[in-house]
C-alpha cells in the first residue's frame, strides 16, 4: 500500500502511539522526494513540461495548501512534486528541466514526530503489534480498569476537510486487559480481515447502545482468498474438538483452565467443562503433547477436521451443472462458444483432489437439451443429445448418465464441449425456458446437492418462471421505479428456498444487451449462497469482453467453495444475534444455511444486548461447518474478543467507520428492496444527522463552537461514505440508470467483502502524470508494486493536462485531460497525437519506455484484490476517457467523483452544509 499522505490528527487521536497509521514525518523543509532547487534530483527523469505557476507543488497542491487556524490538526502535507507531465508553458521549450518546488510538511509536535519515526522504523502498522496505550485519566463512572481504552479525539469536519487517506487507516485497536487470553499469542484475537466489529469497545447495556445511535454488528468474511494455499489457516487434524456442554461454543484462546488443567471454563456462558482425554496427546507421534502449542488455544482463526458425528450423510462431491442458454441471442453474441471453450480450458482448475467431482450440461432454448456423455474408453465416445419439449413437467430421460464424473469422462467431456457450439450454430429460436431448465436441473442434482451455474443472454420468456419486459423508461427516477426492483414472479423466491433445503446453490452469469430482469433472477443466488455476475451489452467479438469473462469464469470454476455449509455466531451471555444480512437462507433464528459457501462474499450480523454485561471482555465466535471440495467435513472457527465499557466516549472512540458503513450499506439495500429507493436514501441522511447530533449533544458539550461540525477523528470518513452510498449506482436518484444495472449494483452493495465495498462506494483515484518516483515500481522490502497516494474524488483535484486512474473495483477509467501534452500521449499510448487516441474499453498498449511500464503496473496493481486481503474473481474493464471526448463516457466517469454535484445530487460541501443545518 502506498503510505497515507501524512499526519492523521497527531496521533493522540485514538489514544495510541504516534506510529498508528501515520507515516514517518519528513524534515520540515523538504517533502519526500522533492530535491531542493539546486540539488540534483537523484535518478534522471524525463520531464515533459515545467510548471507554469509556483503555488504549492504539482496537481495535488490542494491536499495540503492552507493550514487550519491554530495548525494543531496535522494537515496533509502537499504531494511531493514529481516533475512529471505538467502543464505546457506556452512559447517555452517543453523539454526544459525545472526543479520541483519543495513542499512543506505539516507542523507536528517534536515528541510526536520523534515517536512516529521510532514506531515507523519498528514497522508498527499492524494493530495487533501496537505497544501499550498511553494512559488516559479513567472516567468517574467506570470501574477502575487495567488498561485505558481508545481516547476520543474531536475534530471539526468543516475546518479540517476529509482526506481520502483516512479511509486506509486500520480500525481503532482492540484494547484488552492483560492476561485475557490463556497463552500470550500474537494471534489470539481475530484479525480484521476475517471479522470486524462496528464497535471495538462494547457498551455494557442496551440503553447505552441505544443512546449512542451507533449499530453493534459484525462484518464477517470467513475466507480471505479463493484458494486455501493463498491464505492458509492452522488446522486441528486430531478430531479432538472440545465444546461447551451448554452453549456449544468451541474451545478458544480466551477460555480459562481450572483444576490443574483438567477442566476449562467457557468464556461465553461460564460453565465448567471437562478437558477431553486426548486433548494433550499427539496422535501423529503417539506421545504426550504440549497443550500450549495447540492451534485452537493460540489462534483465533482455526479449522477443525470434523469427526463422524458432524455428518448427516457422507460428504457430498463437488457437482457443477451448467445451464447454458443456446437461443439466438446467446449464439450470435458468442456466449455459447466462449463458455464451451472456457469450461474446456478450465477442466484442470476445477477442484478434484478426491476424484469425485461431477459435471452435467443442459442446453436451453424453447426446449431442454440433455447430454449423455459416455466414459472414456467406451466403444462410442459420441455424446448423445436428448431433447425434452414438455416444459411444465420436465422429466429426466436417463437420470444415470446425465451427471458424469470428471475423472472418468475427461476426454469425452472435451469432445462434447468442442461440438457444443456446432450443434446450435444455425438456431433461430428466440425462446428461453430457463425456469423450466432450473426445475429440471434441480431434479437431476437434488439427490446429491451441488451448484447450478446459469449462463444466459435472454430473458426467461416461456415455461416456469417466465418473465416479461417490464422496464418502462418513464418510471425511472420516480417513486414507481422501486417496483421494478422487486421480483416479478414468485417462482424465483419459492424455488430458491426449495434449492436451499436440497443443498443446491445457483449462480447467475447474465449477458443481455436488452432488459433481462436481474431483479427477479438475482433472488436465486440471494437465498442459496450464490452470486449474480452481470455483463451488460457483452459481446465476444470485442476481445476485452471475451477475455474478461474467460478470466473471471475460469477463476470462478477454480475457487475452493465449501459445500452443505451452515454458519452460526455465538456470544457471551447477554448478547444475542439479532439480524443476518447476506446471500443465504436464514433457516432458524440463528442459523444461516449455505448449499455452497463462496469465498468472495461478506456477511453482516447485527448483535442485540439483552441483559447487562458484567464482564470486562465479551467474545463473539463465528463457526462455519462445511464440506471442503476434497470431501472433508470441517469447521472454521473465528473468535473475536472485545473490551466492554459503560462510557459513551469509549464507544465513539472505538467505532470502526468502515464496518459501520458496511452495516448501513446492507441496511440500505434491504430498505430499497422493501420500501423503495427514496426511503433508503432518506434513512442514510437521517442516520448521519442522528450520529452528528448525538455526538454534539452527549460528547461535545452541546456547543456550536464557531459554527463547526464536531465528530471524532476515527469516524471522520462516515459522512462522506454515507453521501457516496446515496450517490452509488444502486441507490442514487436518476432517470438514466437501467433497472438491471441498478439491481446488479444492489447485489454488490450487499455481498462485497469490506475492502472491495469501500472502494465500490468511494472509488480510488490516482494522479499518474505526476506520480512519485517510486510509484509503479516494486517495493524494495516486499516486492509489491507501489501505488501513488490516492486523491479525493473531486473535479477540483483534476488538472486539464493530467492523466488519472479512477477505479471502483468493478470498472477502471483512465482519464486523459484535454490539454495533455503530446509527449504524455506518446509515452503512455504510443501515439503521435491525442486525436488518434480512441476512447472506450481497451487494454493499455505495451510501449517501450519506463513511464508506460509504470502506468501499466499501477493499473494492474489497483486490480489486485489479493493485496487487499480478499478473494474475488472480478477483472475490471479499463475505459479510456478523454475529457473533451465522448460525452456519455465522460459523464459516466464523472459519476465516480462523489464529492462533486451531479445528476440531481449534492456536492460534498453542500452535503456537509445541510448536515450542519440539521444538526
UniProtKB/Swiss-Prot annotation:
InterPro entries noted in UniProt: ADF-H/Gelsolin-like_dom_sf, Gelsolin-like_dom, Gelsolin-like_dom_sf, Sec23/24_helical_dom, Sec23/24_helical_dom_sf, Sec23/24_trunk_dom, Sec23_24_beta_S, SEC23_SEC24_subfamily
Keyword Metal-binding: yes
Region (Disordered): 1-43
Source organism superkingdom: Eukaryota
Region (Zinc finger-like): 244-269
GO BP field: COPII-coated vesicle cargo loading; intracellular protein transport
GO cellular component, one term: endoplasmic reticulum exit site
Cytoplasm among keywords: yes
Composition-biased stretches (Low complexity): 1-38
Location in the cell: Cytoplasm; Cytoplasmic vesicle, COPII-coated vesicle membrane; Endoplasmic reticulum membrane; Golgi apparatus membrane
Residues binding Zn(2+): 244, 247, 266, 269
Protein's membrane topology: Peripheral membrane protein
Molecular functions (GO terms): SNARE binding; zinc ion binding
Keywords: Cytoplasm, Cytoplasmic vesicle, Endoplasmic reticulum, ER-Golgi transport, Golgi apparatus, Membrane, Metal-binding, Protein transport, Transport, Zinc
Protein family membership: Belongs to the SEC23/SEC24 family. SEC24 subfamily.
PANTHER family xref list: SEC24-RELATED PROTEIN, SECRETORY 24AB, ISOFORM A
Subunit-level organization: The COPII coat is composed of at least 5 proteins: the sec23/24 complex, the sec13/31 complex, and the protein sar1. Golgi apparatus membrane; Peripheral membrane protein; Cytoplasmic side.
Function description: Component of the coat protein complex II (COPII) which promotes the formation of transport vesicles from the endoplasmic reticulum (ER). The coat has two main functions, the physical deformation of the endoplasmic reticulum membrane into vesicles and the selection of cargo molecules.
Protein name: Protein transport protein sec24
Organism: Aspergillus niger (strain ATCC MYA-4892 / CBS 513.88 / FGSC A1513)
Amino acid at each position: 500500500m502506498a503510505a497515507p499522505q501524512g499526519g492523521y490528527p497527531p496521533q493522540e487521536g485514538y489514544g495510541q502511539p504516534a506510529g498508528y497509521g501515520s507515516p514517518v514525518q519528513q524534515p520540515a523543509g523538504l517533502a519526500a522526494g522533492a530535491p531542493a532547487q539546486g540539488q540534483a534530483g537523484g535518478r534522471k527523469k524525463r520531464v515533459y513540461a515545467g510548471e507554469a505557476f509556483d503555488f504549492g507543488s504539482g496537481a495535488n497542491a490542494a491536499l495540503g495548501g492552507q493550514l487550519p487556524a491554530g495548525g494543531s490538526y496535522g494537515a496533509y502535507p502537499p504531494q511531493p512534486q514529481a516533475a512529471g507531465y505538467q502543464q505546457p508553458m506556452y512559447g517555452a521549450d517543453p523539454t526544459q528541466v525545472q526543479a520541483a518546488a519543495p513542499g512543506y510538511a505539516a507542523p507536528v509536535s517534536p515528541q510526536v514526530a520523534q515517536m512516529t519515526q521510532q514506531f515507523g522504523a519498528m514497522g508498527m502498522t499492524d494493530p495487533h503489534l501496537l505497544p501499550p496505550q498511553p494512559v488516559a485519566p479513567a472516567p468517574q463512572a467506570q470501574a477502575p480498569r487495567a488498561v485505558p481504552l481508545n481516547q476520543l479525539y474531536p475534530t471539526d469536519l468543516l475546518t479540517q476537510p476529509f482526506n481520502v487517506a483516512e479511509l486506509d487507516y486500520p480500525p481503532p485497536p482492540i484494547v484488552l486487559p492483560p492476561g485475557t487470553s490463556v497463552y500470550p499469542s500474537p494471534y489470539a484475537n481475530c484479525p480484521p480481515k476475517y471479522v470486524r466489529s462496528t464497535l471495538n469497545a462494547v457498551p455494557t447495556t442496551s440503553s447505552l447502545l441505544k443512546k449512542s445511535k451507533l449499530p453493534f454488528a459484525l462484518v464477517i468474511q470467513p475466507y480471505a482468498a479463493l484458494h486455501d494455499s493463498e491464505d492458509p489457516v492452522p488446522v486441528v487434524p486430531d478430531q479432538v474438538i472440545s465444546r461447551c456442554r451448554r452453549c456449544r461454543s468451541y474451545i478458544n484462546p480466551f477460555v480459562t483452565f481450572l483444576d490443574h488443567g483438567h477442566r476449562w471454563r467457557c468464556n461465553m456462558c461460564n460453565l465448567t467443562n471437562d478437558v477431553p482425554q486426548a486433548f494433550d496427546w499427539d496422535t501423529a507421534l503417539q506421545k504426550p503433547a504440549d497443550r500450549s502449542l495447540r492451534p485452537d488455544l493460540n489462534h483465533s482463526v482455526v479449522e477443525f477436521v470434523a469427526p463422524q458425528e458432524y455428518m448427516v450423510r457422507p460428504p457430498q462431491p463437488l457437482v457443477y451443472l451448467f445451464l447454458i442458454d443456446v437461443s439466438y441471442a446467446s449464439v450470435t453474441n458468442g456466449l455459447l462458444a466462449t463458455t464451451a471453450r472456457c469450461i474446456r480450458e478450465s477442466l484442470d482448475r476445477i477442484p478434484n483432489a478426491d476424484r469425485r467431482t461431477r459435471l452435467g450440461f443442459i442446453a436451453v432454448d424453447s426446449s431442454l437439451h440433455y447430454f449423455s456423455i459416455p466414459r472414456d474408453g467406451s466403444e462410442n465416445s459420441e455424446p448423445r443429445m436428448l431433447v425434452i419439449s414438455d416444459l411444465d413437467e420436465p422429466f429426466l430421460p436417463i437420470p444415470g448418465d446425465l451427471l458424469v464424473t470428471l475423472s472418468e469422462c475427461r476426454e469425452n467431456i472435451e469432445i462434447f464441449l468442442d461440438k457444443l457450439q456446432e450443434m446450435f450454430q444455425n438456431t433461430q429460436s428466440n425462446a428461453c425456458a430457463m425456469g423450466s431448465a432450473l426445475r429440471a436441473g434441480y431434479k437431476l442434482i437434488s439427490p446429491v446437492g451441488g451448484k447450478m451455474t446459469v449462463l444466459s443472454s435472454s430473458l426467461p420468456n416461456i415455461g416456469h418462471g417466465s418473465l416479461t419486459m417490464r422496464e418502462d423508461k418513464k418510471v425511472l427516477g420516480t417513486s414507481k421505479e422501486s417496483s421494478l426492483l422487486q421480483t416479478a414472479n414468485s417462482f424465483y423466491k419459492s424455488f430458491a428456498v426449495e434449492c436451499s433445503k436440497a443443498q443446491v446453490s445457483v449462480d447467475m452469469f447474465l449477458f443481455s444487451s436488452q432488459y433481462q430482469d436481474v431483479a427477479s433472477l438475482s433472488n436465486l443466488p440471494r437465498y442459496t449462497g450464490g452470486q449474480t455476475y452481470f455483463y451488460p451489452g457483452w459481446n465476444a467479438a470485442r476481445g476485452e469482453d471475451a477475455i474478461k469473462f474467460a478470466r473471471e469464469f475460469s477463476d470462478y470454476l477454480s475457487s475452493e467453495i465449501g459445500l452443505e455449509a451452515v454458519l452460526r455466531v455465538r456470544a457471551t451471555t447477554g448478547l444475542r444475534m439479532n439480524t443476518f444480512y447476506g446471500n443465504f437462507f436464514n433457516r432458524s433464528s440463528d442459523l444461516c444455511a449455505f448449499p455452497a459457501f463462496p469465498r468472495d462474499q461478506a456477511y453482516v450480523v447485527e448483535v442485540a444486548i439483552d441483559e447487562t454485561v458484567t464482564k470486562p471482555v465479551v467474545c463473539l465466535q463465528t463457526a462455519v461447518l462445511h464440506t471442503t471440495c476434497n470431501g472433508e467435513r470441517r469447521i472454521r472457527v473465528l473468535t473475536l474478543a472485545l473490551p466492554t465499557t459503560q462510557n459513551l466516549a469509549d464507544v465513539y472512540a472505538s467505532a470502526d467507520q468502515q464496518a459501520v458503513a458496511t452495516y448501513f450499506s446492507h441496511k440500505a439495500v434491504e430498505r430499497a428492496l422493501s420500501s423503495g429507493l427514496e426511503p433508503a436514501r432518506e434513512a442514510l441522511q437521517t442516520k448521519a444527522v442522528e450520529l452528528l447530533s448525538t455526538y454534539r449533544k452527549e460528547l461535545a458539550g452541546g456547543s456550536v463552537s464557531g459554527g463547526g461540525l464536531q465528530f471524532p477523528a476515527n469516524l471522520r470518513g462516515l459522512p462522506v461514505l454515507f453521501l457516496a452510498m446515496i450517490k452509488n449506482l444502486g441507490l442514487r436518484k436518476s432517470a438514466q440508470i437501467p433497472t438491471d444495472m441498478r439491481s446488479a449494483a444492489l447485489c454488490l452493495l450487499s455481498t462485497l467483502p469490506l475492502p472491495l465495498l469501500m472502494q465500490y462506494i468511494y472509488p480510488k483515484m490516482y494522479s499518474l502524470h505526476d506520480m512519485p518516483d517510486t510509484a509503479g515500481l516494486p517495493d524494495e522490502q516486499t516486492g509489491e508494486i507501489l501505488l501513488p497516494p490516492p486523491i479525493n474524488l473531486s473535479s477540483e483535484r483534476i488538472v486539464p493536462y493530467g492523466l488519472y486512474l479512477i477505479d471502483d473495483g468493478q470498472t477502471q477509467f483512465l482519464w486523459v485531460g484535454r490539454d495533455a501534452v503530446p509527449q504524455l500521449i506518446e509515452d503512455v499510448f504510443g501515439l503521435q497525437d491525442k486525436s488518434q487516441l480512441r476512447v472506450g474499453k481497451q487494454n493499455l498498449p505495451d510501449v517501450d519506455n519506463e513511464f508506460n511500464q509504470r502506468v501499466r503496473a499501477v493499473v494492474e496493481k489497483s486490480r489486485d484484490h489479493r493485496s487487499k486481503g480478499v478473494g474475488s474473481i472480478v477483472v475490471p474493464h479499463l475505459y479510456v476517457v478523454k475529457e473533451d471526448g465522448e460525452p456519455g463516457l465522460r459523464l459516466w466517469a464523472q459519476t465516480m467523483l462523489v464529492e462533486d454535484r451531479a445528476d440531481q445530487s449534492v456536492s460534498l460541501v453542500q452535503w456537509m452544509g445541510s448536515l450542519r443545518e440539521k444538526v
